[in-house]
Amino acid sequence: MADRNLRDLLAPWVPDAPSRALREMTLDSRVAAAGDLFVAVVGHQADGRRYIPQAIAQGVAAIIAEAKDEATDGEIREMHGVPVIYLSQLNERLSALAGRFYHEPSDNLRLVGVTGTNGKTTTTQLLAQWSQLLGEISAVMGTVGNGLLGKVIPTENTTGSAVDVQHELAGLVDQGATFCAMEVSSHGLVQHRVAALKFAASVFTNLSRDHLDYHGDMEHYEAAKWLLYSEHHCGQAIINADDEVGRRWLAKLPDAVAVSMEDHINPNCHGRWLKATEVNYHDSGATIRFSSSWGDGEIESHLMGAFNVSNLLLALATLLALGYPLADLLKTAARLQPVCGRMEVFTAPGKPTVVVDYAHTPDALEKALQAARLHCAGKLWCVFGCGGDRDKGKRPLMGAIAEEFADVAVVTDDNPRTEEPRAIINDILAGMLDAGHAKVMEGRAEAVTCAVMQAKENDVVLVAGKGHEDYQIVGNQRLDYSDRVTVARLLGVIA
């Protein structure tokens, strides 16, 4: 199928499909070009079948479209000389179609999927860094972007469309990648975007409140994440046993690797396991001692906080389960670097320590504050806000958490989008017992500046919510803004 022929592509579903050479595959009629395959899916916001005439006018070689019903599944028509093949449940089949089109890229590298509410980005980055230190050519796909390590290109979504995912993976294979760590979002799982991928391993970090504007409740959110293990080729399963949901899943996955730093593992009950036996936190990270089915060891980590110890242990267990030698992993562990915008520490002589993190859920904010407290000799400041046009229920929860775990809470804008910024702030303040003690400042840059300039040398300022992002969405505008750049400028250092 090197020439990407329509007949070969559709062989499993439509044996009598016509022969047509295909150049590229796209869901977007606006970029469809001569020789392309246009796939007209019915999406949440638009029906791609409406754009078939536009695609034909632009010279596409063939079209695959959503069938009206089961009776028309496999039907072949011709419009202006262009074959149009109708398939039912096209969204569900799209990952498999794209996989065949791009020559099954997940067969040609070690692909690790990481799902969970928090920790996906750090865990994928650690997996990619560590495997590369052991000789792989490693890549990442997720929130920060897609690409080989050091050459990551920013993306809009954690998990792209089913076609985008297979296309990106194929590009990575073409660049020589032998290992890829991919963030797998709940949206991506529900919408079948990774349905046909063959994961060598699948990692579950944790589950807490997020995306309830989409899933409705925690039960449906958990069910979405569980799809990675119940409906996908998940390979080795690595599960965080410190998470309540993780413990439930371990009971259903007897062959999974259980990982804990809170003594939630009984070695006599789990087939394979890894647990921290002692963790000592210090200014530059933590010293971690652990025992496991593969042996015991000690790691010096440059990452801040308990949840990053958990992320590191999950990455370690995954690589051990995939067959990388423990001795080699221990030799290279000290070379692992913190991830951009994930508990990223900025320091300067005579200035407070500033930590920039992506925490934008109640659980993530609590863990980030607890992590920062471990390294704080003075007062702990928290600068944060909540996104507009998103789950409003988490706003008072995050206000309560900031009030409880920080000494000084500075409430500001995040990405207000089309909501009134002050209304979002008021929702946050409603969760505080004494909102009068919070500092309120709508302009995010001004709020960060206020906190950093007023904090003392022994204080720690956590700037939470945006992490690696270099933009702010106000109304329908995407404005240039970066917490990292703002903090670096205030401290006189390089971001």
Swiss-Prot record:
ATP binds at residues 116-122. GO terms for molecular function: ATP binding; magnesium ion binding; UDP-N-acetylmuramoylalanyl-D-glutamate-2,6-diaminopimelate ligase activity. Pathway: Cell wall biogenesis; peptidoglycan biosynthesis. Its EC number is 6.3.2.13. GO terms for cellular component: cytosol. Activated by potassium phosphate. Optimum pH is about 8. The keyword Disulfide bond does not apply. The keyword Magnesium applies. Carboxylation is probably crucial for Mg(2+) binding and, consequently, for the gamma-phosphate positioning of ATP. It catalyses: UDP-N-acetyl-alpha-D-muramoyl-L-alanyl-D-glutamate + meso-2,6-diaminopimelate + ATP = UDP-N-acetyl-alpha-D-muramoyl-L-alanyl-gamma-D-glutamyl-meso-2,6-diaminopimelate + ADP + phosphate + H(+). The modification N6-carboxylysine is found at residue 225. A motif (Meso-diaminopimelate recognition motif) lies at residues 414-417. Its cofactor is Mg(2+). UDP-N-acetyl-alpha-D-muramoyl-L-alanyl-D-glutamate binds at residues 27, 29, 44-46, 157-159, 185, 191, 193. Keywords: ATP-binding, Cell cycle, Cell division, Cell shape, Cell wall biogenesis/degradation, Cytoplasm, Ligase, Magnesium, Nucleotide-binding, Peptidoglycan synthesis. GO terms for biological process: cell division; cell wall organization; peptidoglycan biosynthetic process; regulation of cell shape. Belongs to the MurCDEF family. MurE subfamily. This is UDP-N-acetylmuramoyl-L-alanyl-D-glutamate--2,6-diaminopimelate ligase. It comes from Escherichia coli (strain K12). The lineage of its organism: Bacteria, Pseudomonadati, Pseudomonadota, Gammaproteobacteria, Enterobacterales.
